[in-house]
Amino acid sequence: MEQYKHDFIEFALSRNVLKFGEFTLKSGRKSPYFFNAGLFNTGRDLAKLGEFYAQAIQASGLNFDVLFGPAYKGIPIATTVAVALVNQFDVDKPCCFNRKEAKDHGEGGNLIGSPLKGRILLVDDVITAGTAIRESMEIINANQAELAGVLIALNRKEKGKGELSAIQEVERDYGCQVFSIIDFDDLIQFIEKSEQYAPYLASMRAYREQYGV
C-alpha cells in the first residue's frame, strides 16, 4: 500500500471519520465500518484532506482541465484540492461547482467559478447510489465538456442492488474511470498489520465475502 493511503486511513481514524464496529447503513445492511467525510470540517482537516486528494490525482496520472465539485459536499473538496495541487505540485487547475437551484439574478446560471470546458475531473467524498454523478453528467454534457474521471475518498467496493457496485455502474454508463484515495481492500490490508484493529479483521473479511465486488 502506498504511504499516502496508509496515512489517509490513520488520518480518517484520528478524526472519527472512519470507525470500525457494528453499524446499520441506510440500505439496511449491517456494516463492520462506517465512513463519514462530513467530519472533516475544520480548516486543518480540509487542508490535509486536499493534500490526500492531490496525491491520489498525481498517482493516477490523469490528464484533466477543470476540477468540478457537485453541490453540496463536493464544493469544499474541489476548492481544497485545487489549493493543494498548487501548494504540493505547482499544478494550477481551475475549479467549478454547481448550485442546486439556478439563480435569476447576479452571477447567472447554475455554475460558480471556472467555465466548465474540456476534460473534467469530478471530486466527491463517496459514491453510494451514483445520483450526484448522474446529475453532474447533465451539467457537463450541457456545457459540451467531457468527464475525464471521478475521484472519491473511499471506494467501498460492494454490490448495489444488483451484482455491480454503484461505482462499476458509473464506469459502465459514462465510460470514465472512477478512482479513490483508498478502497475496501486497503482497509483490510491496514487492519492486517494493526494490533489495535485486528479484532475487526474477521468481520471485515466476512463483509467482503458477502457484499464485495
UniProtKB/Swiss-Prot annotation:
Its cofactor is Mg(2+). 5-phospho-alpha-D-ribose 1-diphosphate binds at residues 26, 72-73, 99-100, 103, 105, 124-132. Coiled coil: none annotated. Pathway: Pyrimidine metabolism; UMP biosynthesis via de novo pathway; UMP from orotate: step 1/2. SUPFAM superfamilies: PRTase-like. One of its GO terms (cellular component) is cytoplasm. GO terms for molecular function: magnesium ion binding; orotate phosphoribosyltransferase activity. Keywords: Glycosyltransferase, Magnesium, Pyrimidine biosynthesis, Transferase. Gene3D superfamilies: 3.40.50.2020. One of its GO terms (biological process) is 'de novo' pyrimidine nucleobase biosynthetic process. It is an enzyme of class 2 (transferase). It holds the Pfam family Pribosyltran. Homodimer. Catalyzes the transfer of a ribosyl phosphate group from 5-phosphoribose 1-diphosphate to orotate, leading to the formation of orotidine monophosphate (OMP). Belongs to the purine/pyrimidine phosphoribosyltransferase family. PyrE subfamily. This is Orotate phosphoribosyltransferase. It comes from Actinobacillus pleuropneumoniae serotype 5b (strain L20).
